[in-house]
């Protein structure tokens, strides 16, 4: 009887931890996680490898010292691809700026990793250029300087239907892809993604939003825009669809013109200009991540995506994955110290940061 119990326990333990899913700080399966790689700040003593971690079971950030560690969170999750079974697993790495080729400025501005077996898998959205490598996990030295974002969701294999459609709309550029025949048969749109085939010329719908459930039943919303949408995914799609004011952190250091804070009668989307992350203050110019947080406690949305708020990206594909989680929302909302206000006097800036609330109360003149 004792031997029988040990064998049963061993099978359950091995199977539970052997699932292809997002991995936590201990390398164990988790429903979803967020990682914020901190920028290299000489005055604060950060090396550019430190990160903070939050998942479905967290109440606050957990600090990590080395984003390059293959055994925790991002590293443990991505490393599953390198040991995957080619005949039985689907995998996909995509990037507009991958480790193999020069940057692509025509197709979608999007970066991610996905891996599935016949039951479950994960989708990881990230902002890191030249990442991940094709043979084994490592984090590029060139991406240590700026802040970066990661959002991973574990999901059942049937959601490859929605993911394939999402990748087709955003024109995700594959640099590693493996589609066994059983996946190609069940999810034929994956072959369109592999062949870089996008929407037909007859298409009239240039954006989609789809609910996707994690393995634990959390509903996420995936938003995708094709380049012919010709608009800002944050303001023209996510803010308007959810009827919320957003603060968006994105890369605004490029050569293209910035869109700037957008305030209309139907939506407001503010560019973040200054942040405080776990006690570290830094300007948006130190950050390459792409995320948004709502200003609504009744609709506490946090989104992680592909797109910068620059005019050149209006005519490129890209997406975002959004989650409603009050603990995560409170953390991200508290990050925002300053946003660019509405320019027009006819629109009152609706995003209330810590700085604006304290200033309005007469407690501080400037933070």
UniProtKB/Swiss-Prot annotation:
Pfam families: DNase_II. GO terms for molecular function: deoxyribonuclease II activity. Keywords: Glycoprotein, Hydrolase, Signal. One of its GO terms (biological process) is negative regulation of antimicrobial peptide production. Residues 1-18 form the signal peptide. CDD domains: PLDc_DNaseII_1, PLDc_DNaseII_2. Its EC number is 3.1.-.-. Glycans are attached at residue 253. Belongs to the DNase II family. This is Cell-death-related nuclease 7. The gene is crn-7.
